[in-house]
């Protein structure tokens, strides 16, 4: 063996050994993150179920929502987290290396429970992303990972918590990689995110966390006429997704402009939600509203339901209450889809499912995740309809999004690099 051949073999052995060690490292740490974040996500699921059932049993708790808001603001001030950037901080940490403090996890855990206990209109997946991102980042700091590896740990944590809480491991694994920079997928995190997501889902399943699944009763044949109807629904959902994003961001801006004091803002915001609840006459639009999604599948919701949920959620989150925006987007999409189906005479349960997924895609700018979550929530039988609707919603929702720190790296309309933040 000559010297050149020997050096080549040594180089390849060293190179492949380094790859093997790196792979083993990520398998080990993704399991750790999956266990920790999955356990926290599972605990959060049960805690949220308890407070939701308690509120449904005692509906008068809604009148204490302003006090709950003051408690949330006080907790964040006590923990010296006055900037309160939430999910946006987790996303920007992957872009810029900002620190995600560990205190974010218990803060969002407790604050979201307070919001739901007293009837704020919010979701839960946003809380899961913050909890998971905080846990992943903290584990990375403990083991002295460099900045790039910490970014992967944050994505692992986000995937794990989302998977445990919502029971969609496929979508959860991809979501954290896709949502950060629209047009660029962080494939470096693929193996860690998949493992973390599956581990977390396994933990949740062990403790009998119920996976969300909605059965579509009747799926019509995929004809040209039906494809036109679904395309029209997707286009309308893109417009509704813009309306939802604008409502959320505008309400926050208006609250801050006219009520600059955080305590006053959250107290008045809580009063607004109480007044809105009294005007409606029920608490259909408080909390997550997951039961309304099932009613939409059955074809029985009020036509104004999607607009009222937008208003309730904007009043709640804009004032400073905590939770997520994703489940409200499911609610809005489902009720709007049901309305479309009832008005056009097209299968309401299918329109509900397509509306739900299309609106999710429009507000998150994540078409691959949207397709995967459609399979996990509704099965594969409606695949052609989801496959057609999602691209329309993605393209026509423009550069709007739930999270201002989300980057649109490549244009939706040209093969050009734009690297701009969402509206």
Which residues does each PLM region occupy?
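Alpha-helical transmembrane segments and immediately membrane-proximal extracytoplasmic
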Residues: 1-423
């Amino acid at each position: 063996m000559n010297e050149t051949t020997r050096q080549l073999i040594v180089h390849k052995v060293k190179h492949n050994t380094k790859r093997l060690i790196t792979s083993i490292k990520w398998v080990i740490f993704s399991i750790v993150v999956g266990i920790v974040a999955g356990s926290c996500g599972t605990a959060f699921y049960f805690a949220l179920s308890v407070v939701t059932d308690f509120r449904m049993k005692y509906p008068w708790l809604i009148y204490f929502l302003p006090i709950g808001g003051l408690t949330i603001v006080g907790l964040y001030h006590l923990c010296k987290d006055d900037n309160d950037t939430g999910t946006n901080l987790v996303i920007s940490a992957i872009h810029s290396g900002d620190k995600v403090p560990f205190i974010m996890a218990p803060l969002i855990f407790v604050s979201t429970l307070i919001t739901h206990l007293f009837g704020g209109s919010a979701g839960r997946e946003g809380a899961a992303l913050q909890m998971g991102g905080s846990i992943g980042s903290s584990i990375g700091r403990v083991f002295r990972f460099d900045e790039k590896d910490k970014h992967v740990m944050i994505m692992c944590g986000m995937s794990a918590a989302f998977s445990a809480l919502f029971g969609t491991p496929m979508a959860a694994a991809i979501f954290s990689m896709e949502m950060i920079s629209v047009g660029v997928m962080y494939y470096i995190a693929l193996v860690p995110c998949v493992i973390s997501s599956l581990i977390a889902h396994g933990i949740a399943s062990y403790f009998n966390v119920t996976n969300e699944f909605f059965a579509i009763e009747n799926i019509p044949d995929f004809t040209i006429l039906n494809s036109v109807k679904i395309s029209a629904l997707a286009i309308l959902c893109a417009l509704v997704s813009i309306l939802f994003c604008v409502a959320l961001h505008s309400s926050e801006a208006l609250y801050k402009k006219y009520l600059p004091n955080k305590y006053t803002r959250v107290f008045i915001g809580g009063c607004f939600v109480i007044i809105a609840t009294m005007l409606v006459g029920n608490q259909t639009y408080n909390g997550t509203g997951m039961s309304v999604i099932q009613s939409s599948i059955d074809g029985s919701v009020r036509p104004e339901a999607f607009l009222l949920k937008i208003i309730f959620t904007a009043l709640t989150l804009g004032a400073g209450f905590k939770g997520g925006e994703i489940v409200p987007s499911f609610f809005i999409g489902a009720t709007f889809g049901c309305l479309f189906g009832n008005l056009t005479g097209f299968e309401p349960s299918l329109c509900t499912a397509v509306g739900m997924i299309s609106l999710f895609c429009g507000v998150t700018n994540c078409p691959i995740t949207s397709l995967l979550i459609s399979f996990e929530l509704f099965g594969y039988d409606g695949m052609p309809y989801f496959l057609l609707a999602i691209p329309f919603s993605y393209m026509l929702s423009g550069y709007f999004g739930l999270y201002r720190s989300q980057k649109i790296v490549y244009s939706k309309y040209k093969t050009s690099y734009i690297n701009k933040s969402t509206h």
